[in-house]
């Protein structure tokens, strides 16, 4: 059994589980930090492990362009290449092709696109994506799919779904004939924000024996309430026995709400990206280290945080470093933001085990959203909906 459910929450769809991979077990629900180029930005693999990561995500598209999957293969695979011994999930790069690449063109065979780096023309196919991920040797792999932005028409979304499903079959065929048994291929449920299409995608995927299912096409410009609505609906259709992966979503409030809806796996660039812009997480919302109020603040970023940053340094010191563009400040903020999310996931798992996830969710959201001054009106509206 690849995925084992240990505890089911009685009041929500949340589950406590273990996902077995070639490079070890993962406790779920789990957050995966993103190491796009084969490294979590500013941190060493040892630091990433110390903050609590059990699995990381790397990007097929970026590693294909640089250094090239053949280089990684010759280096012994991605684990050895980057010095990470725990599980790795690689996404297909489909989202990046649609968001970064120039002059892309899609047909039944694949995607033609120009590299965002130097304009080189490439042809990205389901088979090539599988070949790249075979060379990388990642534990969990994703098929090429078409990810559309919010607002795409019904017929555009339906056509994209049909192609995505056909590409999934081609990906499975390639994997089955390529000595990739140790790699877990998840399916990606697309369908945009049309419930009928999401339902069709799930029903057709249930006829295929996949070890896990991912929700794609989420967090692509839609309002938060619409995002939660489509997540909740789609998860209600998914089989209990398979892990559920919500792609590209990982704000603190999204983790708590997503777990209560039945999501097992999350990834997001937000904690590392925000850190490089001076933003850090606290139990009372996001704060910005550049603010003048921290000039003579000799307290840690978060009083009860056990991370290296909070044990050793003050807001005043980190603010000083950040304003001088010292890269050490990016590292310190990244360590804190990731540890904040991993502590949050630890508390979520503990609350599921103790049968009090709903209470924890209300306590966390009340504290986290109430004092967040950024986008105050939007946050207050979201807060009222989440606590219903």
Swiss-Prot record:
One of its GO terms (molecular function) is tRNA-guanosine(34) queuine transglycosylase activity. Binds 1 zinc ion per subunit. SUPFAM superfamilies: tRNA-guanine transglycosylase. Its EC number is 2.4.2.29. The active site is at 91 (proton acceptor), 267 (nucleophile). It comes from Dictyoglomus turgidum (strain DSM 6724 / Z-1310). This is Queuine tRNA-ribosyltransferase. It catalyses: 7-aminomethyl-7-carbaguanine + guanosine(34) in tRNA = 7-aminomethyl-7-carbaguanosine(34) in tRNA + guanine. HAMAP family: Q_tRNA_Tgt. Signal peptide: none annotated. Its cofactor is Zn(2+). Catalyzes the base-exchange of a guanine (G) residue with the queuine precursor 7-aminomethyl-7-deazaguanine (PreQ1) at position 34 (anticodon wobble position) in tRNAs with GU(N) anticodons (tRNA-Asp, -Asn, -His and -Tyr). Catalysis occurs through a double-displacement mechanism. The nucleophile active site attacks the C1' of nucleotide 34 to detach the guanine base from the RNA, forming a covalent enzyme-RNA intermediate. The proton acceptor active site deprotonates the incoming PreQ1, allowing a nucleophilic attack on the C1' of the ribose to form the product.
